Amino acid sequence: MHILWLVRTTLPQAAAACGLAGASDVSGSWLTGQLAALRACPDLHLTVLCVGKEDADGTADGVHYRVVRDTAAFAPLLQAERPDLVHIWGTEFDPAAVMADAARASGLPVLFSVQGVMRDCAAHLCDGVPEKYRRSGALWHTIDKIIPGELLDNMQTSFDALAAKEAAALADARYVTGRTAFDRAACAALAPHARYYPCNETLRPLFYTGTLWHARDFAAAPVLLLPQGNYPLKNLHTVIKALPAVLAEYGDAELRIAGWPPLDKGPLLRPVIDRMFPYKLYCKRLAAQLGVTEHIRYTGPLDAAAMRQAYLEADVFLLPSGCENSPNSLGEAMLLGLPCVASAVGGIPSMLANGTEGLLYGDALDADALARAVLQVLHSPDGGTAMGRAARARALQTHDAARNAADLLHIYESILQEEHP
């Protein structure tokens, strides 16, 4: 059985096999785990096609990797590779549509894997952000064309375009795979003629073994970990609003945010940078207004090992996003046994049971509810240990590499049997 994958980024395995500069192990992290599990399947011939900045190919551990710059290469590549099935990871990127058309023209079945549900991500992108930060004038759009920033109206336009591409790709889909009640419902609406196959994700191997999280005596200085805060869907603004209630009881509490801090090039350029990065400006002003600026720290970008350590050093993991499907960061935190507090949106309730495996709060923008959930964990006599252990047990089932690989192979076999009875 020969399966061709299309992925939107150059995976670390592909970069190594093709002799390219190292790719980030953050991008496409769910694919690296799934790929590692599938390599052991003796009856599977796997070709992984990545979209990158230069053409390259190579083979490692029995997997053939191809990196292409131009989607015009897809049709001849299919003729050369002659796979039995094309598996497209993601629905909203331009090469997905090109590959789907090329595969159908060659008479090949196409399986789409739903990642985020862009329809809902676009709808909730700027929830809770004041209008004055969401709209930028003509001058700032002109500057943005020369020196790109992060104007929120541009970001909204981009998300809306991704949602439209997702809808177009799924409208003609015959086979889709997902993993939550949320994406299943989305596929029922967006891909009404498709057969839906459930299949969970396999995460980065580093998070399955080694030291687990343990509660510590944090006294007045608990650490709250937010895995991303650079754009409004991740809802940093609501976390900032929740901080005063936490600080009222734990005066030295710290919010750690994985990623780069807001750009600062000194007082002369600061007004321009602030206008070019309005969401960061809003969060900066909000933190200053609430008196919590000194309690917020950015870690800088973290590779897998550093991110693992960040989980272990935290006391509570936060995921207050306005929309998520099956966030890898939540799965990783659960695998390590870290107590989790998350918004009850999208696919999150399919991953974590409220009250036993972590705490979910209803409205993502409800800062009071978020603060109460965080304080409930911090107040618990065991520091959230019991919830963390239950979360780890659940995550070991959800992200079981061998089972997920077997499920995916069964999906391939079922589709091919239907196509060639």
Language model region names:
Residues L4, T177, A215-K234, I240-L243, ...:
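Conserved donor-binding/catalytic core segment of Leloir-type glycosyltransferases
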Residues M118, R134-Y175, A189:
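Membrane-proximal helix-turn-helix segments that form the acceptor-binding/catalytic region
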Residues G322:
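Aromatic "clamp/platform" in nucleotide-sugar-dependent glycosyltransferases that forms part
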Residues L78, P301, Q309-A314:
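Short alpha-helical donor nucleotide-sugar binding micro-motif in glycosyltransferases
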Residues P267-P301, A305:
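Nucleotide-activated donor-binding/catalytic signature segment of Leloir-type glycosyltransferases, i.e.
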Residues M1-D57, D61-R66:
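N-terminal subdomain of nucleotide-sugar transferases
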Residues P339-A342, L352:
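Short hydrophobic beta-strand element within catalytic cores of glycosyltransferases
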